[in-house]
Amino acid sequence: LGEAEFLDSVRHFRDKIENPDLKQQVKGFIGQEAHHSRQHQFVNSELDRLGYRTDKIEKDLKKEIAKLVAKQTKQFRLAYTVCSEHITAIMAEYALNEPAFLEGMDAPMKDLLLWHSVEEIEHKSVAFDVYMEVVGDVKYLNKTMKIAIIIMHLHFTQRMFKLAFNTKHWANFREFAGFMSWMFGKGGMWRSLRQPYKSFYKKGFHPWDNGGLELVEKWQREYAQPEQNKASTEYQMGHPA
């Protein structure tokens, strides 16, 4: 659902792009995000199978996106996509930099998230470059980011509460509190993202200032080999013959 809105927000400005290289990057971005949408459907079906109720979250998300489309300008929607892509990219970079983040996860799901993280990094500058070429208002973009980060924190917490208390897996509050501490507490993911998040506001900022290509190259060397993990018991359990 989120990917569909990201795509629409960029498509609205597609005809105004003059840079031929950027036009090609937008084409690739659209293809990747469409594929991500299908992968999210797969993940949601797996979560449903495990007892997590993702249908309620999807229903709420549809309403949120409908309100955004109805009430906000095309400029705001593109700016919001830029902000979302930045936050998603720094989360992806964190996942690739911190092996413990995915520790204990089943091999097929871990491989999927690593792959998804790599693709988020690969196209992390596309929406930003489109915005800068067709709009170029940095002050507006920075204001949008301040709104976006608050909304994302609120929505993330809200959705985790819904997942936690609509499934038997998180029946006790202690387990849920531990997860929230892991995400938001000292040494948690969100605190670790402070510096890369703040870099967004630096004068002359560009998404590639934070690097990231080295993580993509490392993944391609170490993980992008389908045969590599097939010998593991975890992989075989997730991919029955």
Task: Give, region by region, the residue ranges found by the protein language model.
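Non-heme di-metal
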Residues: 1-241
